[in-house]
Structures are given as structure tokens and as C-alpha cells.
From Swiss-Prot:
Gene field: AGL80
UniProt protein name: Agamous-like MADS-box protein AGL80
One BP term from GO: positive regulation of transcription by RNA polymerase II
Subcellular locations according to the entry: Nucleus
Note: Plants lacking AGL80 (mutant fem111) have defects in central cell and endosperm development.
Source organism (scientific name): Arabidopsis thaliana (Mouse-ear cress)
Tissues and organs where the protein is expressed, per its UniProt entry: Expressed in the central cell of the female gametophyte and in early endosperm. Also detected in ovaries, young siliques, roots, leaves, stems, young flowers and anthers.
Matches recorded under PANTHER family: SERUM RESPONSE FACTOR HOMOLOG
PROSITE patterns according to UniProt: MADS_BOX_2
Source domain of life: Eukaryota
InterPro entries, sorted: MADS-box/MEF2_TF (IPR050142), SRF-like_MADS-box (IPR033897), TF_MADSbox (IPR002100), TF_MADSbox_sf (IPR036879)
GO function terms (MF aspect): cis-regulatory region sequence-specific DNA binding; DNA-binding transcription factor activity; DNA-binding transcription factor activity, RNA polymerase II-specific; protein dimerization activity; transcription cis-regulatory region binding
Role, per record: Probable transcription factor. Controls central cell differentiation during female gametophyte development. Required for the expression of DEMETER and DD46, but not for the expression of FIS2. Probable transcription factor that may function in the maintenance of the proper function of the central cell in pollen tube attraction.
Length: 321
């Protein structure tokens, strides 16, 4: 059976108080002895009481004098570093409890004003009876929320993301984590055409793809080569093609009426499920046919100052824009 917890209060009965003193004093001496023996520290105890004229000491008078002299040899800062009496201990506890109470009151007030703010937004302002202090706190909370909203809007604008899009897209774009697609000229088993709707969308694609990268679409697909093998018969003049592409873009922007023909002729071949960044194998007869068609398309386009990217044939090819 467990002993009932003793209430920490002054004992008004003299006999009970004296008996409790003797019992507790003996227990205190025992605890000091155990602490000194188990932990190997130097300790002493001096107890004054109204029932005895001489104080009781532990372990002895000489032992107490030795411990006190060692304590006085320490610097004053070390002496008061962890020294505490009953009054100081109570003050520390009160200060700690007061700080905890202040922090909890602040959090509770913020939650209360947040609830009032959202209730007012949905038209339930009449259910609250707010005074001047409540209105000031509510105004402070509204200002904080507005600052957060404006800061997020500024972040989205700086990252180039339209308002309403996912914030994760803005973060990824600002950090440069969005990979650029690697376009490779190849055949695909499906026939899907995505048509360009406006000149602005085509300009976006033109800025998205490097003009130098468009050179690979102007040649028919060659035979299958290995990952580390490169065809030796492709002698491209990149500088000349880059200048031609610049003239082509300027011609397109100056003559928007040619956009319909341009969108019908332009496309990017998409990779099939091979997942290799090299040109796929095709039959030899099909290669000659593509070469002839692309040559005719290039001759026709040069006469109208427009450079098509691929041939107009869409059989067994995938186009995307």
C-alpha cells in the first residue's frame, strides 16, 4: 500500500511539528552521506533548530570546516555560479512559469484573432463583440497575412510564373531544375499532329529550341549507329545554318500571313520507346524516299524564303509542338 502524499504546509501542532523535524533531519543526514559516498563528492550539512541550542553537523566539525575553507578559496564568480537559496529558487520557478504563461497567452490570442478574421471574411462579423483592443489585434493579424500574400505574389512574379499556377513550378524554374528536352530525329509508330494556333505560341517554341539544334531535323534518318559511333559523312556548316535560321525567323515575324503554311510544314519528331539518343535504323529504300522528299521540299521552300524543318509527309511519324 502506497503512502499518501504529504501536503507541503506549515504544521501548526507543536508536537507533530517536532516529531516531523526529527524524522526529516535524520533522513536528510542519510541522504547527504549517500550522495558523498556514491558520487565521491565533498559535502557537509549544518542544521539549526529551535529545539537544540547547538547545530547538528555532518560529518563532523572538522569536516565541515575543511569543506567551508575549500569553498571560500574558489573565485567569487564560481561561488555564486550555481548557488541558490530558497528565495532564489522560488524566484527562478516563478520567472519560468511567468514566461511560459506569457507565451501561451500570445499563441492563444493569435489563434483567436485568426478565427475572427476568417469568420469576418465569410460574413459572420456580427457574432463577435469587439472592443478597441480586439480591433487593434485584428488589424495587426490582417496586416501580417497581407504581407505574406504580397511576398508570395512577388516571388511568383520574379520567377516568371503566372498567378494561379503551382508554386512548386516557380521554385523549380527559379532553381533551374527543369530539364530541357533532348530532341532527336527519328521515326515513331503513331501519327499524331499538334497544330500551332498563333504566332505567339510559335515564337515561344522558337525561343525554346536552339536554332543550332534544328539542323539535325533537316536531314533524313540514317542507319542505326552505336552509342559511341558517329556518322562520318555529315559535314554541317553550323554557322551558315544558324544565320539562315535567324533570317527565317525574321521573315516569319515580318509576314504573319505565312504562319499557316509554316505550321503545316514545321514539326518535331518525337522519340519512340527505345530511350536511346541516337538515330534509329530504317530500310534503305525508305531512306532514299525520305531524302528525295526532303530535297524537293527544301527547293520549294528556298524559293519562298521559308526553310521547312522536315518533309510534309506525316506517315508513321509523330509531330508535336
Amino acid at each position: 500500500m502506497t503512502r499518501k502524499k504529504v501536503k507541503l504546509a506549515y504544521i501548526s501542532n507543536d508536537s507533530s511539528r517536532k516529531a516531523t523535524f526529527k524524522k526529516r533531519k535524520k533522513g536528510l543526514m542519510k541522504k547527504v552521506h549517500e550522495l558523498s559516498t556514491l558520487c565521491g563528492i565533498t559535502a557537509c550539512a549544518i542544521i539549526y533548530s529551535p529545539y537544540d541550542t547547538n547545530p547538528e553537523v555532518w560529518p563532523s566539525n572538522s569536516g565541515v570546516q575543511r569543506v567551508v575553507s575549500e569553498f571560500r578559496t574558489l573565485p567569487e564568480m564560481d561561488q555564486h555560479k550555481k548557488m541558490v537559496d530558497q528565495e532564489g529558487f522560488l524566484k527562478q520557478r516563478i520567472a519560468k512559469a511567468t514566461e511560459t504563461l506569457r507565451r501561451q497567452r500570445k499563441d492563444s490570442r493569435e489563434l483567436e484573432m485568426t478565427e475572427v478574421m476568417f469568420q469576418c471574411l465569410i460574413g459572420n462579423m456580427e457574432m463577435f463583440h469587439l472592443n478597441i483592443v480586439d480591433l487593434n489585434d485584428l488589424g495587426y493579424m490582417i496586416e501580417q497575412y497581407l504581407k505574406d500574400v504580397n511576398r508570395r505574389i512577388e516571388i511568383l512574379r520574379n520567377s516568371g510564373t503566372e498567378i494561379g499556377e503551382s508554386s512548386s513550378v516557380a521554385v523549380a524554374a527559379s532553381e533551374g531544375n527543369i530539364p530541357m528536352p533532348n530532341l532527336v530525329a527519328t521515326t515513331a509508330p503513331t501519327t499524331t499532329i499538334y497544330e500551332v494556333g498563333s504566332s505567339s505560341s510559335f515564337a515561344a517554341v522558337a525561343n525554346f529550341v536552339n536554332p543550332i539544334d534544328l539542323q539535325q531535323f533537316r536531314h533524313p534518318a540514317a542507319q542505326h549507329v552505336g552509342l559511341n559511333e558517329q556518322p562520318q559523312n555529315l559535314n554541317l556548316n553550323l554557322n551558315q545554318n544558324y544565320n539562315q535560321n535567324q533570317e527565317w525567323f525574321m521573315e516569319m515575324m515580318n509576314h504573319p500571313e505565312q504562319m499557316r503554311y509554316q505550321t503545316e510544314q514545321m514539326g518535331y519528331q518525337f522519340m519512340d520507346d527505345n530511350h536511346h539518343n541516337h538515330i534509329h535504323h530504317q530500310p534503305q529504300e525508305h531512306q532514299h524516299q525520305i531524302h528525295d522528299e526532303s530535297s524537293n521540299a527544301l527547293d520549294a521552300a528556298n524559293s519562298s524564303s521559308i526553310i521547312p524543318v522536315t518533309s510534309s509527309s506525316i506517315t508513321n511519324k509523330t509531330w508535336f509542338h
